[in-house]
């Protein structure tokens, strides 16, 4: 079951994202997330709580995703409402490998169609090949790269109907 988040879900969102941060750190995976950047006082500068959706497995929070209709950081040329954007997709390790990422991506695709929007976009670390393969297997097409400070390269992806 996928549920749109509300104020009561903030700690759940933080917990799912923290699980991902710990796993990435343990596996020495380069990423932009850290313990501070997944706290709500930071996230709330960029997201509203209802941008988040939580995936539950047998009543247990397993994963989350943020879906927005504007991304000025990576896609400033796209007017608001012309595309949806996936952010903060994270699956708790105990639920990894069970198709939950794909379930959330498909949820985002259906949400875009429901809103009359024919594209879905995302960004991820250029070096995270396994993550990139997940997105490509879900029909996303590589649309370029963006270099951030500290030579941190992001891969940009788009899915069209």
Where are these regions (language model features)?
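C-terminal "cap" of GNAT-fold acetyltransferases
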Residues: 118, 125-129, 136-138, 144-161
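Charged catalytic carboxylate motif
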Residues: 12, 103, 130
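Conserved functional loop/turn residues at catalytic and ligand-binding sites
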Residues: 9, 88-90, 94-95, 99, ...
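Conserved N-terminal entry element of GNAT/NAT acetyltransferase domains
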Residues: 1-11
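Acetyl-CoA-dependent GNAT
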Residues: 7, 15, 22-26, 31-94, ...
């Amino acid at each position: 079951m996928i549920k749109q988040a509300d104020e009561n879900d903030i700690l759940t969102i933080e917990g799912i994202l923290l699980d991902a941060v710990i796993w990435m750190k343990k596996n020495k995976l380069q990423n932009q997330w850290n313990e501070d950047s997944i706290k709500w006082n930071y996230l709330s500068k960029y997201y509203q709580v209802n941008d988040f959706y939580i995936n539950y497995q047998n009543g247990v929070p397993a994963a989350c995703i943020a879906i927005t209709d504007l991304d000025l950081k990576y896609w400033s040329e796209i007017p608001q409402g012309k595309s949806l954007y996936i952010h903060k997709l994270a699956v708790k390790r105990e639920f990894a490998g069970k198709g939950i990422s794909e379930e959330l991506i498909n949820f985002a695709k259906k949400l875009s169609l429901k809103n009359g929007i024919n594209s879905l976009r995302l960004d991820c670390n250029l070096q995270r090949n396994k993550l990139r393969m997940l997105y490509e297997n879900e029909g996303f097409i590589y649309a370029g790269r963006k270099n951030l400070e500290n030579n941190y390269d992001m891969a940009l992806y788009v899915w069209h109907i």
